[in-house]
């Protein structure tokens, strides 16, 4: 296991699934670091946007926030077309795009790339070792490639690779965080009530939430504020 000096850091916050100017306003007002826009994804999601809507919203994001476009492209060409149209600060790739295609995105778009990896939730203990081994291999390959800027670990369940609202085994995420120099973003079922425990357990570079700050399917300003307050009151050590 890699060992590094323990450094006190401030965990960054990404509010994902933004759908309106009000959502952006809440995130900026309460001190988020980034906002995510789920764009043209080929799966059912109450938070997905068409590219025109995503572009219009991203144009309203203040400079104090990073705009992250979350996409599930099958090719680098489709990813690059969306990046060109929507113009985010950062792109989050939430698909099994091969390294060669990721490299093409990096070289032609020249913006930071977050690569999402799915961590199966509700796994039996005997299977956890195999899951950790597989994820570590993926993370090491990404790190050695130098193509991506960070990895995001999200919970997968019942064929869904993210947006489940489910928490996965944070010990898995912690073990991955300890083995890589890539910044690790933790997602999956995070909400005001559990985000401090998540940070203490994993020491992530950032935390990501969507449904955890919603009420009846819409961003709740009280929950957004509470989530960010809980994060700011917790320091992780890396």
Swiss-Prot record:
Any GO molecular function: phosphoribosylanthranilate isomerase activity
Protein name: N-(5'-phosphoribosyl)anthranilate isomerase
Catalytic activities: N-(5-phospho-beta-D-ribosyl)anthranilate = 1-(2-carboxyphenylamino)-1-deoxy-D-ribulose 5-phosphate
Gene for this chain: trpF
Keyword flag Thylakoid: no
Pathway in which this enzyme or protein is active: Amino-acid biosynthesis; L-tryptophan biosynthesis; L-tryptophan from chorismate: step 3/5
UniProt keyword Mitochondrion, yes or no: no
EC number assigned by the record: 5.3.1.24
GO biological process terms on file: L-tryptophan biosynthetic process
Keywords for the protein's UniProt record, in alphabetical order: Amino-acid biosynthesis, Aromatic amino acid biosynthesis, Isomerase, Tryptophan biosynthesis
Organism listed in the record: Methanosarcina acetivorans (strain ATCC 35395 / DSM 2834 / JCM 12185 / C2A)
SUPFAM superfamilies with a match to the protein in the record: Ribulose-phoshate binding barrel
CDD domains in alphabetical order: PRAI
Family membership: Belongs to the TrpF family.
């Amino acid at each position: 296991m890699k060992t590094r000096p323990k450094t006190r850091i401030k965990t960054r916050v990404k509010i994902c699934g933004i759908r309106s100017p009000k959502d952006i306003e809440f995130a900026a007002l309460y001190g988020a670091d980034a906002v995510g826009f789920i764009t043209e994804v080929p799966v059912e999601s109450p938070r997905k946007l068409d590219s025109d809507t995503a572009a219009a919203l991203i144009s309203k994001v203040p400079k104090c926030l990073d705009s992250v476009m979350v996409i599930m492209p099958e090719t680098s060409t489709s990813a690059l077309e969306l990046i060109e149209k929507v113009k985010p600060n950062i792109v989050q790739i939430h698909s099994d795009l091969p390294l060669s295609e990721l490299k093409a995105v990096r070289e032609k778009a020249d913006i930071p790339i977050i690569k999402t990896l799915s961590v199966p939730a509700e796994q039996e203990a005997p299977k956890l070792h195999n899951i950790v081994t597989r994820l570590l291999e993926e993370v090491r390959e990404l790190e050695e490639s130098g193509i991506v800027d960070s990895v995001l670990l999200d919970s997968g369940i019942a064929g869904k690779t993210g947006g489940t609202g489910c928490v996965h085994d944070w010990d898995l995420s912690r073990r991955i965080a300890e083995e890589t120099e890539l910044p690790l973003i933790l997602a999956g079922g995070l909400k005001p009530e559990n985000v401090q425990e998540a940070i203490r357990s994993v020491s992530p570079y950032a935390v990501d939430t969507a449904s955890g700050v919603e009420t009846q399917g819409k961003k709740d300003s009280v929950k957004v504020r509470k989530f960010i307050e809980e994060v700011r009151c917790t320091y992780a050590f890396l």
